[in-house]
């Protein structure tokens, strides 16, 4: 604004002259008046935290407004905490230069230290100042402090959470059990280890999920501090599948304020209960020898065959296999058995054997019965239980051996000439065995052992049955190329033969051979006297009289 000044010159004390009016002057006047900041705690009074848990984070921000008019002539507000009457009251934060008309509801926080249980009562002081920075420039003016009454605000008790402890020794071991066997569940012993001083909540617990072959169930609520529940929650083992069925059961815990803090339910960390147990399947017999065929000749030592079995299993979780013999078909005998054959193993070579009786010729058939048992010995210790039966098909043939009889007496080719063609001589043989239910046939060949004078050929083909004779297939031949007196033998290689066994060589006596091969007479002619000429030699000569006159006297020659 402006101010007009009336001016006069006054000589009093100087010139002594009378006052002289001077011309007036106008003065321009400028300036600003700033009001101080005005602090208002919007949520002053009681901060009611109620009942809280030990370890909870308990805090609340003050809402502070600079209520001075926002017209450009109000200073800004600073705020900060002073002291607190209870050491468990916590303060943090401050406010700087809060503009007129503005509110800060986050920077300054009041809280409670919940490290220990008990009641908390107290008061916190908030200091304020009006700050001219950026407005009046007049610096900082201290304003009256204000108190936030905490007596009612933080008067609730501080409660600790329930503290679960699983007392049952772990792992809970169910040992080895047979597949499908009902397993008695084991109850867990659970303690609420929180102190029983009136400031601890109660404990809720429930089974909630498993791994592996573990089962779990049950729950309880409101277990008092220092209380133990050893019946409500149980763990077990699912025995429907063989193998290592161990795993874990998850137990979910809650701290329940019902009847204590009134704070409702607070989730606590879950805990796992380790469970072990192995489930064994029953023995699984696999018959490796579904059939047996044996052959022998009457009077032989009885041939035997092994019956093999495997306890078939994909892993070690299989009980042992016992095998005992049942009825054995007529014509056969059996022996042996199998005891506690381990998973995946095959019986030893001679564990179970069947033998063919060789007292009577004939064909025999039937079965060998087997009984299978799963034994818990060494695994589950469960009682033996039948796992079925098996049957091995038996077939046996007992042959009466052939009996070789050589019917031909010594063969004499007589006296022949060198170069003669001499007919072969046959050697007759008979299978002299008595016909029975099953007979070998007689087979064989003939030879002369490399003789240069005699040779032999032929065989008995498919063989001679009991009582049959062959007098055409085996023969001997004389070599007449060289004169001489010859003796030799025809050897018979005869065997008892059937389709199931190796041939049985039969002893025979060689057939004696004899022959005389003579040269023809060999005349030699010489001309002694007479006509003509004589030529030639051996068996062919020519007497040549040359040319003669017809009707002339006959020529004569003496030889």
Question: Which role fits each region the language model picked out?
Answer:
Residues 1-559:
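Feature for long, exposed domains in two main contexts
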């Amino acid at each position: 604004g402006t101010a007009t000044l009336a001016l006069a010159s006054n000589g009093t004390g100087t010139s002594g002259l009378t006052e002289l009016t001077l011309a007036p002057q106008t003065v321009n006047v400028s300036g600003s008046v700033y009001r101080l900041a005005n602090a208002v705690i919007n949520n002053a009074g009681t901060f009611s935290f109620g009942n809280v848990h030990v370890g909870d984070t308990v805090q609340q921000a003050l809402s502070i407004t600079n209520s001075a008019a926002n017209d450009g002539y109000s200073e800004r507000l600073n705020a900060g905490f002073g002291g607190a009457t209870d050491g468990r009251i916590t303060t943090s934060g401050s406010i700087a230069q809060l503009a007129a008309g503005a509110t800060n509801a986050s920077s300054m926080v009041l809280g409670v230290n919940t490290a220990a249980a008990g009641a908390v009562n107290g008061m916190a002081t908030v200091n304020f100042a009006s700050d001219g920075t950026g407005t009046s420039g007049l610096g900082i003016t201290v304003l009256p402090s204000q108190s936030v009454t905490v007596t009612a605000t933080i008067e609730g008790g501080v409660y600790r959470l329930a503290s679960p402890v699983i007392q049952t020794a772990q792992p809970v071991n169910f040992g080895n059990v047979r597949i499908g066997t009902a397993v008695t569940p084991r109850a867990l012993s659970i303690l609420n280890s929180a102190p029983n001083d009136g400031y601890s909540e109660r404990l809720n617990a429930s089974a909630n999920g498993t791994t592996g072959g573990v089962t779990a169930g049950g729950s309880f609520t409101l277990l008092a501090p220092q209380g133990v529940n050893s019946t409500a929650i149980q763990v077990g083992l699912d025995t429907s599948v063989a193998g290592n069925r161990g795993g874990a059961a998850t137990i979910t815990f809650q701290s329940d304020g019902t009847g204590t803090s009134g704070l409702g339910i607070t989730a606590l960390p879950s805990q796992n209960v380790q469970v072990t147990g192995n489930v064994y399947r029953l023995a699984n017999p696999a018959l490796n020898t579904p059939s047996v065929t044996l052959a022998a000749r009457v009077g032989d030592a009885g041939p035997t065959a092994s019956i093999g079995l495997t306890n078939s299993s994909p892993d070690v979780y299989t009980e042992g296999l016992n095998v005992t013999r049942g009825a054995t078909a007529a014509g056969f005998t059996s022996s042996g058995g199998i005891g506690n054959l381990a998973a995946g193993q095959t019986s030893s070579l001679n564990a179970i054997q069947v033998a063919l009786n060789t007292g009577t010729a004939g064909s025999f058939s039937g079965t060998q019965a087997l009984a299978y048992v799963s034994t818990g010995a060494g695994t589950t210790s469960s009682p033996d239980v039948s796992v079925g039966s098996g049957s091995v098909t038996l077939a046996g043939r007992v042959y009466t051996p052939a009996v070789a009889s050589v019917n031909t007496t010594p063969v004499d080719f007589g006296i022949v000439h060198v170069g003669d063609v001499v007919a072969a001589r046959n050697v007759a043989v008979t299978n002299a065995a008595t016909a029975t239910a099953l007979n070998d046939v007689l087979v064989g060949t003939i030879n002369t052992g490399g003789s240069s004078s005699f040779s032999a050929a032929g065989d008995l083909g498919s063989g001679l049955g009991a009582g049959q004779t062959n007098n055409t297939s085996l023969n001997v031949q004389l070599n007449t190329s060289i004169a001489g007196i010859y003796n030799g033998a025809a050897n018979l290689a005869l065997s008892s033969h059937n389709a199931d066994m190796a041939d049985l060589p039969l002893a025979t006596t060689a057939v004696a051979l004899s022959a005389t091969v003579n040269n023809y007479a060999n005349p030699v002619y010489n001309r002694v006297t007479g006509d003509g000429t004589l030529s030639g030699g051996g068996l062919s000569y020519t007497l040549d009289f040359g040319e003669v006159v017809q009707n002339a006297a006959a020529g004569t020659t003496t030889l």
